[in-house]
Design a protein with these regions (language model features):
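N-terminal accessory segments
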Residues: 1-85
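Walker A/P-loop
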Residues: 84-103
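Walker A/P-loop NTP-binding motif
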Residues: 99-113
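Conserved nucleotide-state-sensing and coupling region of NTP-binding domains
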Residues: 121-178
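Conserved RecA-like ASCE ATPase "motif II neighborhood" in helicase/translocase motors
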Residues: 160-216
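ASCE P-loop NTPase helicase motor core
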Residues: 204-278
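Mg2+-dependent endonuclease catalytic cores in nucleic-acid-processing enzymes, primarily RNase H-like
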Residues: 246, 250, 269-271, 277, ...
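ATPase catalytic-site recognition across NTP-hydrolyzing enzymes
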Residues: 277-350, 354-357
Length: 416
């Protein structure tokens, strides 16, 4: 039978796929001079250390030395894989979150053999297929996997669904598709991977976010077996105040607080002051690269310099900022002498005090801010002073009057 001739886009995709396979074969060369005993010893040594195993088997992806937080994640997830575990990896761009998860999943299905039915989910079916193709390419072309584990290709081998000779299945699925009834033999899904599940456009619509979250928690999550362990892994940085990743992260924190923890939310920014305590502002100003072997300080500086602060915070520091809600861009600087400000505004919140009941003698808290503006090439607004005290309305009025008299009077009245 004659082969069907590929044309246009299909031919380009086929050529790209063949090039990917060629690169994997080239970069996973095998030392065929090892004796059977040496080969067995080498494999035992590698399998005893998941990090060493990943570095050896997938050199193309592991060409940089692993960072500490990556090693910790690998060992944490593998260490909890025999039970129910809910992991959320909110790592900034260029920190290899999807690649690390691939190493983990392949270790579990090949070495530990405790996972047999994997579902890869993304915002679209095309996206899920592209992510799953990275796994399929390894089974198809990785010479080291073939040398140590034999031919792992099973009887079904498509972009959407493939099986291994060891009776393990992988399925790609976009959100909204029906996952009901998915099984590998008698095994229900025991690994759920959500990668690039959020999109910027969808996160602007709360109804879509709700629908996507409900689809995961109801249709997808309950494809599992109640009696068997499930590994759930989300990968994605926080791109909106309300997105599925942030909801999953909050759920993981709830699970981490249980008497027997079964979850973890790992937030890693491109730079950090303290790897265990993410702080977007402090990390941006004072942090250092969390993966210096790959991302140097100089290259991070160059990348961040080419985009707005809001974009850098969102993509590299897990801090989505809605730019333009109040001020288009904020520049921090020292306030000039008050006499040079053309406009000064005193803004207070004169909330009335409670005059009845047990708390009648307790005045409510009053707030007052003194703001100034100066006009040059652009209008600059400064916070001159701010105060929040438990006072009566009359005292707030006097405070405001003092603020209008000048900075010295303002500082006197604001002093505790």
């Amino acid at each position: 039978m004659a082969k069907k001739r590929l044309t246009g886009n299909n031919r380009t995709l086929s050529d790209d796929w063949e090039e990917t396979l060629r690169q994997i074969r080239t970069q996973t060369a095998v030392d065929f001079t090892m004796t059977g005993e040496e080969k067995a010893r080498k494999l035992r040594e590698l399998e005893a250390d998941p990090v060493a195993w990943a570095k050896f088997m997938f050199y193309r992806y592991a060409k940089y030395e692993f960072a500490g937080f990556q090693k910790k994640a690998i060992r944490r997830i593998i260490g909890h894989s025999d039970g129910n575990w809910y992991e959320v990896l909110s790592w900034a761009r260029e920190l290899a979150k999807s690649t690390i998860v691939m190493f983990i999943v392949l270790y579990l299905v090949i070495v530990k053999k405790n996972k047999r039915c994997v579902i890869m989910t993304s915002a679209t079916n095309d996206g899920a297929r592209k992510l799953l193709n990275q796994y399929r390419a390894q089974f198809e072309a990785n010479e080291r996997l073939k040398y140590f584990y034999g031919n792992l290709i099973g009887d079904k081998w498509t972009e959407d669904y493939f099986t291994l000779s060891t009776r393990v299945s992988f399925m790609a699925m976009g959100w909204g598709q029906s996952p009901r009834g998915v099984k590998m033999d008698e095994v229900r899904p025991d690994v759920l991977l959500m990668d690039d599940y959020d999109t910027d456009e969808e996160c602007r619509n709360p109804e879509i976010v709700n629908n996507k979250w409900n689809w995961f928690e109801q249709a997808l999550f309950f494809t599992r077996s109640i009696s068997e362990a499930l590994l759930t892994v989300w990968t994605g940085n926080v791109i909106a105040k309300d997105c599925c990743i942030s909801r999953a992260g909050n759920k993981a924190r709830e699970l981490a607080a249980r008497e027997k923890p079964i979850g973890n939310w790992d937030i890693i920014n491109i730079r950090m002051v303290d790897i265990n305590n993410p702080d977007p502002q402090a990390d941006y100003q004072f942090g250092t690269s969390v993966w210096p072997e790959k991302n140097t300080e100089e290259t991070i500086d160059e990348v961040l310099a080419q985009v707005s602060l809001a974009s850098g915070q969102k993509e590299c520091f897990n801090n989505p900022v809605v730019e333009g809600s109040y001020f288009k861009e904020i520049r921090w600087g020292e306030c000039p002498p008050i006499g040079k400000l053309k406009y000064i505004v005193s803004y207070g919140d004169p909330a009335p005090s409670n005059t009845t009941g047990k708390k009648a003698k307790k005045n409510s808290f009053k707030a007052n801010f003194l703001m100034g503006a100066i006009r040059g090439n652009a209008v600059c607004i400064y916070r001159i002073s701010a105060a929040c005290h438990q006072r009566r309305v009359r005292e707030l009025v006097l405070l405001s009057a003092g603020l209008r008299k000048g900075k010295d009077a303002a500082e006197e009245l604001h002093r505790e």
